[in-house]
Amino acid sequence: MEILKGLPVANSINEQLIEDIKNIDGELPHLAIIRVGERPDDCSYERGAVKKMDKVGVRCTTYTFAADISNDEFQKGFDRINNNPDIDGILLLRPLPKHIDEKAVENRIDPRKDLDGISPVNLAKVYAGDETGYAPCTAEAVIEMLDYAGVDIKGRRVTVVGRSLVIGKPVAMLLMKRNATVTVVHTKTVDMAATCKHAQILVAAAGSAKMIKPEYVADGAVVIDVGINVDEEGKLCGDVDFEAIENIASIATPVPGGVGSVTTSVLAKHLVKAAHMR
């Protein structure tokens, strides 16, 4: 089994972006990262994103709000960032605290700056196959991984495990745009294992540690693991029981070190795209 790591994929994207940035008129692209509170995973992702933006040579400003900020104050602060003409793109770290109206933010973010595809406008564009929109970065990272590995998507049977708006549904749409035959399975699916085993490409995005066992995977299948979980031993793991499928899959992505490594490079790619569309 070939282990498809994310770092070479990310580096390939980064190299292309560094060249693309040279062709941008005016100021360098400018990303705003918005974080509410001090959730460790948010802080970790923020650090990685800041590092990635520095690596490709774009501007990045972080905006941090207290976890107990009122909804009204946060919405006002968000609007100031959203309406700043110097900012090309916005990354909002989610989930927000429960007292913050996340739907209001999704509806008011400028679709041209919505780099992680949270607005209804961009989700609709992804579903319509309109390339002027932005897909969620993690969903697009799945496609980048497959392309880098030289996996032919056209005509392939693909099963996506999970139907979230963040990964499952948009990645299914991106795969269909590439002419894959896509099946989406979820917690209500009858005989999920049999449906998954029919797939030539299996994308696991359920958020359930090591749920994808050997009986889910066809011989020679390509397995892309989007899950990020903690196992019983407190170790980071994906949705796939990686060691158990080693002698079955032809290609598989690890966790950590797989799709997650590519997500911030896709974010940078979206930022450069936004700057070109000024």
Residue ranges and their predicted role:
Residues L28-E38:
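Short beta-strand segments enriched in small/hydrophobic residues
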Residues V36-V50, G133-V222, D231, K235-E246:
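Glycine-rich phosphate/diphosphate-binding loop of Rossmann-like nucleotide-binding domains
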Residues E73-P85:
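Short, well-structured alpha-helical segments in soluble
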Residues L93, A205-A206, V226:
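Short, well-ordered coil/turn residues at beta-beta hairpins
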Residues M53-A67, V182-V184:
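Short beta-strand elements in bilobed, periplasmic/extracellular small-molecule ligand-binding domains
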Residues L91-I153:
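Anion-binding alpha/beta catalytic cores of soluble intermediary-metabolism enzymes, centered on
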Residues M1-E27:
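Positively charged, low-complexity intrinsically disordered leader regions
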Residues K103-L123, G227-R278:
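Rossmann-fold NAD(P)-binding glycine/threonine-rich loop
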